[in-house]
Amino acid sequence: SCMKAAPMKEVSIRGQGSLAYPGLRTQGNLETLSGPNDATRGLTSLADTFEHVIEELLDEQQVVQPSKENKDADLYSSRVMLSSQVPLEPPLLFLLEEYKNYLDAANMSMRVRRHSDPARRGELSVCDSISEWVTAAEKKTAVDMSGATVTVLEKVPVPKGQLKQYFYETKCSSKGYAKEGCRGIDKRYWNSQCRTTQSYVRALTMDNKKRVGWRFIRIDTSC
């Protein structure tokens, strides 16, 4: 986030991800998907295909909701993953959440967005950021919602062994405009600064009394 001559918030609370990935519907064949008389145009572009898939998933997400009786639903987060190895891609729920937030903020439909994509217009973000998977071994400790420092457990026991906790963190890039101010802000009239902000996610931790449990902790989530 970029702030102009104003105090900055340290933390914001984000909503938690859905319990399961929404289903994906496939309709029609290649000819019907590309429209009538489009045989000479070939398959649709990868970008349009990706947007179509996300649109389907967002539609499904509005219908598929975790059961109110399922007490484990709040243990899932779009930025936390339990895995035996480092994930190769950003979490799907995170991509859906970020994409939906963008559409909601812009108050526009998917088709309108296709013609106003910043990447297609050559636009740059106000603050440069970097996202990567971080292990509990790298984090070691974190601050919970009560302000106490807790130990982030590296491994989570499961019926067939143990899985590692991974956190998908986003922070300001040291190679960007973090020290020089926000991109596009007139330095003659405004003082600006790119800062990493945090949100709460659910993770398995241990407090100073050796009590292990799932708690909300702060991690870097945006710039």
Swiss-Prot record:
Alphabetical list of Pfam families matching this protein: NGF
Location within or outside the cell: Secreted
GO annotation, biological process: cell surface receptor protein tyrosine kinase signaling pathway; modulation of chemical synaptic transmission; negative regulation of neuron apoptotic process; nerve development; nerve growth factor signaling pathway; neuron projection morphogenesis
Stretches assigned to coiled coil: none
MF GO annotations: growth factor activity; nerve growth factor receptor binding
Propeptide: 6-114
Highest rank taxon of the organism: Eukaryota
Positions glycosylated per UniProt: 107
InterPro entries: Brain-der_neurotrophic_factor, Cystine-knot_cytokine, Nerve_growth_factor-like, Nerve_growth_factor-rel, Nerve_growth_factor_CS
Keywords, sorted A to Z: Cleavage on pair of basic residues, Disulfide bond, Glycoprotein, Growth factor, Secreted, Signal
A GO cellular-component term linked to this record: extracellular space
Cystine residue pairs: 127-194, 172-223
Signal peptide: 1-5
Family of this protein: Belongs to the NGF-beta family.
UniProt function note: Promotes the survival of neuronal populations that are all located either in the central nervous system or directly connected to it.
Protein's UniProt name: Neurotrophic factor BDNF precursor form
Originating organism: Charina bottae (Northern rubber boa)
